[in-house]
Amino acid sequence: MPLVEQKEETAADIQGLRLKFPGAADLLFRDLSVKILRGEKVLLLGPSGCGKSTLLQVLGGMIPRVTEVPMKAARLEVPESVGFVFQDPETQFCMPHVDEELAFVLENLAVPVQEMRPRIEAALRQVGLNLPDAHIPIGNLSQGMKQRLALASALLLEPETLLLDEPSALLDPEGRRTIWEAVRNVSDRRTIVIVEHRIEEVIDWVDRVIVFQADGSLVADGPAESIFRRHRNQLREYGIWYPEAWSDAYAPITESKSPALADPIEDQADCPNSSAPRLESELQPLLRLEQFSVLRGGKEACRVDSAIVLPGDLIAVTGPNGAGKSSLLLGLMGLLPRRGLCRYGEYLPEGRRAEREAAAKHMAFVFQNPEFQFVTNRVLDEVSFTLRSEAEHNLQQERRGGSARIGWPFVRRGRLTAEDEGKIERRALEFLHRFGLADYAERHPYLLSLGQKRRLSVASAVVSAKPLLLLDEPTFGQDARNTFAMLNLCEELRASGHAVLMITHETEIAQRLATRVWRVENGKLVDDRSTARSCTDGTRLVMGDADETFF
């Protein structure tokens, strides 16, 4: 009896896709063809901005049904039943409270009211979102908790196809394990397409890896083991994450300052301690906290009994989602009410206004969500805005007989001249080049990929040259190349006497690069420990040639 060949069913089939965003100079995809079989588990890999998220939106039917983008395709067959988890979870919430968000999904499925609560509670347990009361405002959740909620909403749909755009980017290690365990538990007979830079949790169970290069063209397509073995050099060349990327990139520097790290930012004014002695015991702290607490809604959100930040420090702030890490940084910047002692060098501000002014003078801050700090309609203007604001502040200080903010690189002549404006624009363009954003100078910040938005937000903060840089998850959504380049920039700042306070869930950063690790749990700094690195140690992370600059 002859064997009957079983026909493989197609979940999605895209042939000859050509797509171009308004205002972009080039096509994103040029005749891209991808077929995904029903039940396949597919991982999309590629540099930041190569079109992975855009392809997911095409597969989900949002482009062109919801978002009008000029595109053509010889064939466009996409799944009918889709659950989508966006890169930014806040973009998909429709209701103000957690239980209402999940109930809204069930209402659309015509689920009887009496069945909703047990299904909502089960969905929250499935993704590890343990709340004392599900009727809590979504705005009160941390970004990592919002990611769990977004996945719970998608799973409640019980879709045939799950499209996951970095669903674990903002989660702590335990949260990542919980999320991917939940996905695996519902993966049987489902098609799953994943965009994820943190590949360690998924490479063992995906059937297939598709690799793109920066222009959106397909580089490789095959089983994970084969891709990472046969195409390792290409992945390294394109700056894409692969299992050994950290080991290949790590290059300690034994001297306190190397030529690669010296004088990282031209024209900066001297930062306090920039020529400080090498011994940590002789360094003057940039920041000292004593009995310091941050308040949210009148309640204590984070408490620090005692801590200091030294010039040359890179402090990794770690802890589970919702522990109070972001609240701590917001309080330091004066964006949340605070109590206790917060001394900047020798200066101790008194009063709320003095505290905010001192924070603005000594620190720059990068939000977890980069869109929170965009204030202009053009990428170039975002960086120029920071420079111009610093200049205008200094002019006002001069008129009042006060001192200028630290780090201002331009001359001050009582007013901004055309020459100053030219310097500002040239300086801004220099930073865009370094951050890989020069080609997008005229684009609206909201039209960038999430990884590009993150780099723009960091560029806008770093250009101010403040002594202390506060970063809330700066590496999420970044490929390997840009992650290492951003960390190299932090190393350069350290070598110039600056310090970096970085919230991160990346254990490699805490283990390899941090001079200190702060552990925050249940709203309190519970551990402040030194690492093997001192404030005067140097490190450079490389991919490809050691002398290559990636920004």
Predicted regions mapped to residue ranges:
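The feature captures the beta-strand-to-loop junction immediately N-terminal to the Walker
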Residues: 45-47, 318-320
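Conserved ABC ATPase "signature" region
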Residues: 115-133, 398-412, 416, 420-440
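Conserved ABC ATPase signature
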Residues: 137-141, 444-448
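ABC ATPase C-loop
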Residues: 155, 461-462
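Catalytic Walker B motif of ABC-type/P-loop ATPase nucleotide-binding domains
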Residues: 162-165, 469-472
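ABC-family nucleotide-binding domains
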Residues: 172, 479
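H-loop/switch region of ABC-family ATPase nucleotide-binding domains
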Residues: 196-197, 504-505
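Conserved beta-strand-loop-alpha-helix hinge in the C-terminal portion
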Residues: 216-239, 524-550
